[in-house]
Amino acid sequence: MSFILVNPPLFWKLGDSRFSYLDVCRKIGDDPTGLRSLPAEHLGLSSIQAYCAKKGIPVQVVNGIVAEHTSVEPTFAEIEAIVREHGAPTLIGFSGTSHVFQATLRLARMCLERWPNAHTVMGYDFGTLNFEQLLRDYPDIHFVCRGDGEAVFATLAERLANGRGYDDIPGLAYRGSDGRLHANEPAALEIDTLPWPTRNELPQVLRGGFAAGVYASRGCPYRCSYCTLGQTSALFGNKSYRLRSIENVVEEMAYLKKEFGVRHITIVDDLFLTKAPSSQERARDFAEQLLRRDLGLEWMIDARVDSIDRDLFTLLRRAGLRKVFVGVETGSEEQLASYNKRYGLHEETQSDRLKVLRDLQIVIVPGMLMFHPNVTTTEVRQSLQLIDEMGSESHYQMYNRIQLYPGTPLYREYEEKGWAIGEWPVKDWEFRDPRAKGLSDAVLWASIQSGATFQDVRKVFVQHLEAWENNLDITEHSPPSIFDSAALQRSGAA
């Protein structure tokens, strides 16, 4: 009998060549220090594995992304190897975003063909927000975990192994014997009581040049329309944003340094710091504890621009903060409002906050959503100005576009407006103005050319933007569309 957790592979096909997700990260990593702060472990599956181990349930993990698989076959081969050693699977859990759903589906079918008595369960935000469609339309998915996965997976594994019922497990969605769908309300775990995630993948991750990750919280108090985390967090009501104690977080960081020689750690929270006084004080406590422990670690966080305070960040810098991901998204206040993301800052105030980071020599990793269907030259100019103010020389920020994730308000909005194209769950959109598409394609094309610098890409960006502003037709001089070309495919199934 075995219990298996699977992170399906994500890869791209270009002609006859295939590139793993991590290989693509290396190829587009125009910031030479970027990979060092990119966490590659799947802490969610590692946390479930640790929780189950504490309950006496041995769980094996197959991570197709860390293993850099470029098809589902090697992932399935790893599952087969586990079964040969530990016995036929009772429960197989799948994680991942909508972009690996086809890989998940194919792996589930392969597993059930080989071991027809096995059960399958899906999780992650994608499963949480789309459980009805998954259970209604995909018979190879038997269960869906909504919310925290540790207790759901452990309890379900135990019940199935002992032949007991599972209809009362909090957070479990399933098909009843009559075919009707049932969804139990999720329960928010006290995350400070959870065991630390297992670190079986970390040596391989570090050898690949990627970062160790630590989570200090779960959830998010905000509800941006494009983000799955905010929608998942809403299920927990007043427990939508849960914090670990700073002592627990710092102790785990010290453990990673001692046991694995880690020098850089990325705090993987979607939001480590807000403008709330309690959050600011917690960050101060974090810095002071790191300084007292004298761990000598460098680290990275995600923070909202309205949380940046000079005194606080001066202290954080002393304690090892070297990078901050700031989700500024766009230079347009109107577009931010359409995403339900409001800072309430004047333009000059936002610039002042970003200048604090630059003055302290803290690297800004910008979260830019440069393009959407109705983008205008005015907004693009505003966003370009914001990029210049941040001082980041990453190509990615100049061609990144809004992504549609099923279960979010933005996904529903684009469907209602007829903008979403393609098959569920991975849908795309088209530009309303072909000149915007020309700009987007030209910048992406320039960025993937060998040896292209940030200034090279920025020059192409400005040239095409000025042509658009002056109402010149640049589309016929644009390179082939990367997004529409059949030559470049993001895949998780083939």
Where are these regions (language model features)?
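Conserved acidic residues
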Residues: 90, 142, 263, 322, ...
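C-terminal accessory regions of radical SAM enzymes
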Residues: 3-35, 49, 173, 378-494
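Short, solvent-exposed turn/loop segments enriched in Gly/Ser/Thr/Pro and often Arg
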Residues: 97, 124, 270-274, 304-305, ...
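Glycine-rich beta-alpha loop elements in corrinoid/cobalamin-binding modules
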Residues: 51, 58-185, 398, 407
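Radical SAM [4Fe-4S] cluster-binding motif and immediate context
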Residues: 40, 192-364, 385
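Catalytic cores of alpha/beta
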Residues: 132-137, 312, 374-388
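N-terminal [4Fe-4S]-dependent radical SAM core
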Residues: 2-3, 9-10, 14-19, 24, ...
